[in-house]
Amino acid sequence: MNFRNLAIWLVIVAVLGGVFVVSQNSRTKSSSEISYSQLLKDVDAGKIKSAEIAGQTVLAKTADNKTLTVNAPMNSEELVNRMVAKNADVKFKSGSISFLAILVQLLPILLVVGVWLFLMRQMQGGAKGAMGFGKSKARLLTENKNRITFEDVAGVDEAKEELQEVVDFLKDPAKFQRLGGKIPKGALLVGPPGTGKTLIARAVAGEAGVPFFTISGSDFVEMFVGVGASRVRDMFEQAKKNAPCIIFIDEIDAVGRHRGAGLGGGNDEREQTLNQLLVEMDGFEANEGIILIAATNRPDVLDPALLRPGRFDRQVVVPNPDVAGREKIIRVHMKNVPLAADVDVKTLARGTPGFSGADLANLVNEAALMAARKNRRMVTMQDFEQAKDKVMMGAERRSMAMNEEEKKLTAYHEGGHAIVALNVPLADPVHKATIVPRGRALGMVMQLPEGDRYSMKYQQMTSRLAIMMGGRVAEEIIFGKENITSGASSDIKAATDLARNMVTRWGYSDILGTVAYGDNQDEVFLGHSVARTQNVSEETARLIDSEVKRLVQYGLDEARRILTDKIDDLHTLGKALLEYETLSGEEIADILKGIPPKREEEEAATAVIAPSLVPLSPGAGASVTA
């Protein structure tokens, strides 16, 4: 609320109230009001010296100079005759009403009107007018000092190329039109969260040189029926006035979800908004010169009519970057960061598989904050490594008190994961093992792939099952079955999920064959899920459970076989983890060869733990596989 406006209205109310009080007091103090019959008695008694008559109001003055006010009948001849008979001085005055009297009479009305105007102005400030709910909330971006260009976008070359063509079309349409090409009507940016979809759209705004409107998908639907469709119409009306132009809708899945997916009857405001959007994009009336760019990380929930050519002519995939893309992105975010000589961008890029652009931006920022916290003038490689740990696993919880028994359980649990990972085929190299609590995990083993991976082999999956079971088996072998902890709960869940996917999605079961089962498990529409039936019989469901159990049991048996054969290595690694708390992959290999790790006491206290892709266990230990 605007404090200045509120203060003005309070002053006005106070002034009007003061005028009313003063007028009432002046009337009270200036005269005493008596009845008409009392006035007649005073006249007959000779107490009235003079009188002034104005309409029905009589101001009579007594012999002792008191003023009496009387409301008399109109044209009261009897009163005048009696006064004349008693030699009273009688004057007649025209019945005019003073401005103050008028103001006092109008005061209640003025107060009501003032309050109404005040409320209306407040509504106008928040919603572009008292009836401004149907107005578009799209903002027109203008060039400023924070202008983003394609130079600020890295690691998504294909997406940049697609949208660069749109920008070129707006700048020089004749280049394309001479060959019969038409300007694309829309481009849909699709990709996981944090890959830079909105950043690319901002770069288009900076490069295009045409008006750029931006709005969120959630800005369309409000509490009133019909507001969403009205805002869509208003948005395109604004765009037509500024054509050629670009409209960017962020998170379009908020308004563009599949129609007919809800339960129950009644009007669906979101569907009405979507229908209006479909008509405006490619309906009876063409909107020439308006390009619509939208972003979503849920293309599977969008309505098919929204995705067809003529509305969104292009679907631009913005994936997580590969190692080369990560290197470019890191360099972009390092532009304003003073770096020490030991910082190796290529190593950082190789050590961050699966990171999105937002993750990498956060990584660089966390490293800079850590260096500033230590009063350094430059950011070192150690800061980046520690920042990776914080981004992926949370901050260290060195203050957490663990007794010796819990530490020993955790050390052997993590040692079991690491020993199995070193002895199964096609496993990713062990990068780090730690028993320092981080986040919800009391310890972790991290495996880092040697390169980006886009698919997995059957043997890699079975090896991963064995690695996941390694921690629980190690606890059983070292401490006995009766002392197994709940620390492997998330290991068991992750192994079960992997085995179920192997059976139901990837066809790794000879009994069930290469058939996809339970294809509606990820159904995002409640209405569709209720309407559809499960596509597996009870017998097939039992077979699926049986095959899942068989695969998990295979991983358990394989882990038991390896740890039984490598029991000496398990004891060696468990004791080393208790002593050093954090070990790198190279140090683990040296320890198993009988070579103690070579590091200073300071380095041991600030040992760096490399990140992992999937932390599995929040309990007494976690196995992380990449």
Swiss-Prot record:
Query: Where does this protein reside within or beyond the cell?
Result: Cell inner membrane
Q: What does this protein do?
A: Acts as a processive, ATP-dependent zinc metallopeptidase for both cytoplasmic and membrane proteins. Plays a role in the quality control of integral membrane proteins.
PANTHER family, A to Z: ATP-DEPENDENT ZINC METALLOPROTEASE YME1L1, METALLOPROTEASE M41 FTSH
Just give the chief location class: membrane
Q: What is this protein called?
A: ATP-dependent zinc metalloprotease FtsH
Residues recorded as binding Zn(2+), renumbered to this chain, are: 413, 417, 491
Per the UniProt entry, the Enzyme Commission number(s) are 3.4.24.-
Q: Oligomeric state and partners?
A: Homohexamer.
Instruction: Kindly report every residue range on the membrane side named Periplasmic.
Output: 27-98
Q: Which NCBIfam families match?
A: FtsH_fam
Q: Catalytic site residues?
A: 414
Which leading EC class covers this enzyme?
A: hydrolase
- What gene is behind this protein? ftsH
| Species the sequence originates in | Caulobacter vibrioides (strain NA1000 / CB15N)
